[in-house]
Amino acid sequence: MERLVEKAEILMEALPFITKFRGKTFVIKYGGNAMAKADLKVAFAQDILMLKYIGINPVIVHGGGPQIGQMLKRMGLESKFVGGLRVTDRETMEVVEMVLGGLVNKSIVMLINRYAGGHIRAVGLTGKDGGLIRAKKLDAQEYFRQMGDFRPTELLDLGHVGEVEYIDTQILKHLEEDNYIPVIAPVGFDTEGNAYNINADFVASAVAGALKAEKVIFLTDIEGLKDEQGNTVSSINVERINRMIEEGVIKGGMIPKVKACIQALSQGVKKAHILDGRIPHCVLLEIFTSEGIGTEIVS
C-alpha cells in the first residue's frame, strides 16, 4: 500500500508541471551514452512519448559522432579532428550524411515508433527536408575565437563543417499539427546544394530559437555544470556562466555546449537544461520534479 501511495504522490508532484507545459515545445539534443546503451535508449523513447501523450511537443536533434567514426574506420578513411571538430572533406561528408541521415536517424525513429501507440509517430528529417536547415561553411577562426581557442589560420580549413544560417520551421509545424515527433539529423545544406556537417548542439539551439521553444534540453555524459568546488549547479544564469568561462571553471568541450545554451536563450527560449543522459528517464525527472536532476540555465 505504501508503494501505491508513493506512486500517487509522484503523479501529484508532476501535475502542476504537466499543466504548465501542456502545448509547449521542448527541443531535446540526444547524444552520448543515452544513444549507446539499450536500456537508456528505451527509457529515452518512453520519455519522449510520455511528453507527447500529455500534450508537450518534443523535437529531437541527435548526434552520431561515434557512429561516423566507426563507419569511416570500416571504409578505411581517417578521422581527423581540430579543436573537437571533425575535418570533413567531400568523401567524409558523404559518409556523415549517410550515417546521420540514414543509419542513426532511422534507428531513433524506429525505436520511438516501436513503443508508440495510437496516432503518434516519429518521422526522420535532415536539413534537406522542407529546406529545414540552411547552412554555410563554418568560419572556423571566428568559431575558435568564441570558444577561447586561438589557432594558426593555416589549420582552419575544416572542409564541409558548417554552421546554421537559417531554420525554416514550416515542416516542423506541420508535423506537430499532425501529431508527429520530428527527429532531426544535424546535416545542413546551402543554396548550391552543398552538404555540411554541423555540431548537433548548435542545431538544437537554432531549432529551439526558431520555434520559440519553452526549453532546450541537452543530454550529456556528465551530471551537469560544476562550480568552483566541483559541485553540480542546479540553476545558473548567463552572467555567471560567462564569468566561469573567463575563470577557467568551464572549459574544453563544455564551452560549446554552454554557448549553445546561451544562443538559444538569446533567441527567446525560456530555459536550457544540461542533463546526465546516463540516468534512465532523466528528461522526466528534470521536467516533472521540483528538485530536478541536472543544471537549468536562465537568462
Curated annotation (Swiss-Prot):
Enzyme class, broadest EC rank: transferase
One Pfam short name: AA_kinase
Catalysed conversion reaction: N-acetyl-L-glutamate + ATP = N-acetyl-L-glutamyl 5-phosphate + ADP
Primary location class: cytoplasm
Compartment annotation: Cytoplasm
Keyword NAD: no
Gene Ontology biological process terms from the UniProt entry: arginine biosynthetic process via ornithine; L-arginine biosynthetic process
Pathway recorded for this protein: Amino-acid biosynthesis; L-arginine biosynthesis; N(2)-acetyl-L-ornithine from L-glutamate: step 2/4
GO cellular component: cytoplasm
Superkingdom field: Bacteria
Site note Transition state stabilizer, residues: 29, 257
Keyword terms: Amino-acid biosynthesis, Arginine biosynthesis, ATP-binding, Cytoplasm, Kinase, Nucleotide-binding, Transferase
Annotated positions binding substrate: 64-65, 86, 197
GO molecular function, one term: ATP binding
NCBIfam families: argB
Similarity comment: family membership: Belongs to the acetylglutamate kinase family. ArgB subfamily.
Function statement: Catalyzes the ATP-dependent phosphorylation of N-acetyl-L-glutamate.
UniProt protein name: Acetylglutamate kinase
